A protein has these predicted regions:
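Class I S-adenosyl-L-methionine-dependent methyltransferase catalytic core
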Residues: 1-164
């Protein structure tokens, strides 16, 4: 559906949900305010009610779908709750390479929490950095279109983005 088209218009999440568009690969960079709000919900189901990513999932359950959430490591628990609320199964955490040996505190470092659904894909690819362009490159290599980036403005062919 999105082949040979360039999507770079800013759309609010509520409008995107009403559009009935569906995505197989979603990258989310939540704001600190969103993280704080989700942390205080009494049920993880409330996350999807507040932020209805489940409404955007691809309809074909035979296609691999993934959701990548970039957060500080101290928010891994909330990210996994988000994946569960949105119907994704937690797969892995991708953390930056550490210059020190041994166990180090990553709580203030950005990590990528990855979840999936549908037919599984096993990959051993790494991500160059936590920059949006590198996240997009990784998602294109590991995921399926259509693609959605939530939380930042991106200007990438065949990607739609959503702010707010």
């Amino acid at each position: 559906m999105f082949d040979n088209q360039k999507f770079n218009s800013e759309i609010k999440l509520s409008i995107l949900v009403k559009s009935k568009l569906h995505f197989n690969t979603i990258i989310i960079i939540p704001s600190d305010n969103q993280i704080d709000k989700w942390k205080n919900f009494s049920s993880i189901k409330d996350i999807n009610f507040d932020y209805p990513i489940r409404s955007l999932e691809g309809l074909d359950k035979n296609i691999f779908q993934q959701c990548l959430i970039k957060v500080k490591a101290k928010h891994i628990d909330i990210s996994i709750n988000c994946l569960n609320s949105w119907g994704y199964k937690y797969n892995k955490i991708m953390a930056p390479r550490q210059p020190k040996s041994g166990l180090v505190d990553l709580s203030s470092k950005f990590v990528l929490v990855v979840g999936s659904k549908g037919l599984s894909k096993n990959n051993r690819l790494t991500i160059k950095s936590d920059q949006s362009t590198d996240l997009i490159y990784y998602a294109k290599k590991t995921g399926n279109s259509p693609f959605l980036f939530i939380g930042e403005v991106v200007n990438e062919k065949n990607w739609m983005y959503c702010i707010n």
